[in-house]
Regions:
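Charge-dense, helix-prone N-terminal extensions
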Residues: 1-148
C-alpha cells in the first residue's frame, strides 16, 4: 500500500470533568482532597450541574467552573487555601457565614478554606442550591422579557 496516506484520527479532547479530576489528583495533600470533596458536594446538589474548564492561558492552566443556567462557582487552589468563588455570591443568603473572602465586592463572594478547616457541608450545599435558584430565576426573567 505504498503511496496511500491513512488519515490519523484527531486526538480526543480531554473533557472538563477529566481535567478537574486530574487537577484534584495533582495535589498530593489536603488541597486536592478538599477540592475533590467540594466538587462532589456541588455535583450531588444538582444532577444537571455542568462542569467547565475556563480561562486557560500561558500563566494559568485553567480553572474549574460549575454552571447551571449560568456560573455557580469556580474552584481554585493556592499554596495555603482552596478558594470557591460564587459568581453572584453577594446576592445569596449566607446564614452560616461561609463567605469569608471577597466580601467588599458588589457581585462575587468567596469561601477560603485553609488546611484543617472543616466545611459545613449542609450549608455549602444550601449555597450551591441558592446560586442555582438565582441563576434559574434570572434566566426565566430574561426569557420573559425577551418574549415581550
Amino acid at each position: 500500500m505504498e503511496g496511500i496516506t491513512v488519515p490519523k484520527s484527531a486526538p480526543k479532547e480531554e473533557t472538563a470533568a477529566s481535567k478537574i479530576t486530574k487537577r484534584t489528583q495533582e495535589y498530593g495533600d489536603w488541597r486536592g482532597v478538599t477540592l475533590a470533596r467540594l466538587r462532589q458536594l456541588i455535583l450531588d446538589a444538582d444532577p444537571e450541574m455542568e462542569e467547565e474548564w475556563k480561562w486557560v492561558k500561558p500563566t494559568n492552566p485553567g480553572v474549574p467552573v460549575w454552571s447551571h443556567d449560568g456560573g455557580v462557582c469556580t474552584g481554585e487552589v493556592y499554596k495555603a487555601v482552596v478558594k470557591l468563588t460564587f459568581a453572584k455570591g453577594a446576592s445569596l443568603p449566607d446564614p452560616a457565614k461561609l463567605f469569608n473572602s471577597s466580601l467588599d465586592g458588589n457581585v462575587r463572594r468567596a469561601i477560603d478554606i485553609h488546611e484543617g478547616q472543616a466545611v459545613d457541608e449542609a450549608a455549602f450545599t444550601a449555597l450551591v442550591l441558592e446560586a442555582i435558584a438565582l441563576n434559574s430565576a434570572s434566566k426565566s426573567k430574561s426569557s420573559k422579557t425577551a418574549k415581550s
